[in-house]
Amino acid sequence: MGANHVLNPREVDPVQQILAITDGLGVDVVLEMSGNAQAMRQGFKALRNGGRVSLLGIPSRVIELDLANDIIFKGATIFGISGRLIFDTWYRTRRILEAGQLDLKQVITHTLPFDQLHEAMEIMKTGDCGKIVMTM
């Protein structure tokens, strides 16, 4: 996958680290998949001018963002997800999972400690795996 840097937000301020790594410019693209309010705010703060944010996670509540500084003045482009059946699909999937009709444990083919991230990436490259879970 070619990751040059991996940051654990429990140990460091990811925005400060990203800005330090990019000489204060920020990242070109943010892919926010958790829906976590803090992660979304950090993503916008770490974005470079003219950068792109793809919001793929669904927040559980309203999120306050600094629209002027983090979006408007940066000229950020924001993408969401859409599709007429997206919510219907999610709700159906949730019902199936909650009812125990589908055992997703079979999808998990590997569980590795986080310090074996490189090995996990190599396994993924082979295509000979399902879901790889990294533990900390």
Regions found by a protein language model. Give the residues of each.
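Adenosine-nucleotide cofactor-binding segment
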Residues: 1-42
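Conserved beta-strand segments of alpha/beta enzyme cores
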Residues: 4-5, 77, 103
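Hydrophobic packing within well-folded, soluble alpha/beta domains
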Residues: 6, 18, 30, 47, ...
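Glycine- and other small-residue-rich loops at beta-strand/loop junctions that grip anionic moieties
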Residues: 7, 28-33, 56-57, 81-82, ...
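Short acidic loop-to-helix transition motifs that present clustered carboxylates
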Residues: 12-14, 63, 113
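Glycine-rich phosphate-binding loop and adjacent beta-alpha segment
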Residues: 36-99, 136
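C-terminal hydrophobic helical "lid"/dimerization subdomain
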Residues: 41-45, 87-136
